Amino acid sequence: MSRKIEGFLLLLLFGYEATLGLSSTEDEGEDPWYQKACKCDCQGGPNALWSAGATSLDCIPECPYHKPLGFESGEVTPDQITCSNPEQYVGWYSSWTANKARLNSQGFGCAWLSKFQDSSQWLQIDLKEIKVISGILTQGRCDIDEWMTKYSVQYRTDERLNWIYYKDQTGNNRVFYGNSDRTSTVQNLLRPPIISRFIRLIPLGWHVRIAIRMELLECVSKCA
């Protein structure tokens, strides 16, 4: 997708109003799911997030307000979440499919467990349409000490296109650090956000076994 199209999508996005957001800073122990007043600095001024005629992601290094996409709430449907080697999920593993990768899920089958433990495994989300994704939340398995310790992210706007790795400032594939226990939620914000339809998490490290509960954060505009 060209920079001009990306810019146009962001311009449309930030033209809408939003009244509910998540803090764009890392959670330091307080509940991140709270209402926050909007500031009207979307255009003009030294802290502007968007300026007239802007056509690149450089104009929006980070998203100020976020909302959960719907893994935990169920708005993200089972058919939107897929994984590597789906045909292997039979017997005991049939309770630990990709659809179980939902933040704060509890009980038996509370996470996605990869059948194989190597860096060729993946968890994929089809957003059904192009969205602006600004963050990723992860947890480990709820009942046993198994979790993902680090991962990379791929994305693409169309299933006919090749996957693109999310890069760091040096141009290398960015490594996101994940969990260190089974219960804590680790938040990684995307600066800049990803504008895409398909998102993949590629586990690069894990404790005992690849186990993921997750949520995606969608970027929403500031109030007009």
Curated annotation (Swiss-Prot):
Changing residue 207 to Q: In XLRS1; decreases protein stability; does not abrogate oligomerization or secretion. Restricted to the retina (at protein level). Detected in the inner segment of the photoreceptors, the inner nuclear layer, the inner plexiform layer and the ganglion cell layer (at protein level). At the macula, expressed in both the outer and inner nuclear layers and in the inner plexiform layer (at protein level). Detected in retina. Detected only within the photoreceptor cell layer, most prominently within the inner segments of the photoreceptors. Undetectable in the inner plexiform layers and the inner nuclear layer. The keyword Membrane applies. SUPFAM superfamilies: Galactose-binding domain-like (SSF49785). Gene3D superfamilies: Galactose-binding domain-like (2.60.120.260). Residues 63-219 form the F5/8 type C domain. Pfam families: F5_F8_type_C. One of its GO terms (cellular component) is photoreceptor inner segment. Disulfide bonds join 63-219, 110-142. SMART domains: FA58C. GO terms for molecular function: phosphatidylinositol-3,4-bisphosphate binding; phosphatidylserine binding; protein-containing complex binding. It is linked to Retinoschisis juvenile X-linked 1: A vitreo-retinal dystrophy characterized by macular pathology and by splitting of the superficial layer of the retina. Macular changes are present in almost all cases. In the fundi, radially oriented intraretinal foveomacular cysts are seen in a spoke-wheel configuration, with the absence of foveal reflex in most cases. In addition, approximately half of cases have bilateral peripheral retinoschisis in the inferotemporal part of the retina. Homooctamer of 4 homodimers; disulfide-linked. The homooctamer has a flat, cogwheel structure with a diameter of about 14 nm. Two stacked octamers can assemble to form a hexadecamer. This is Retinoschisin. The lineage of its organism: Eukaryota, Metazoa, Chordata, Craniata, Vertebrata. The gene is RS1.
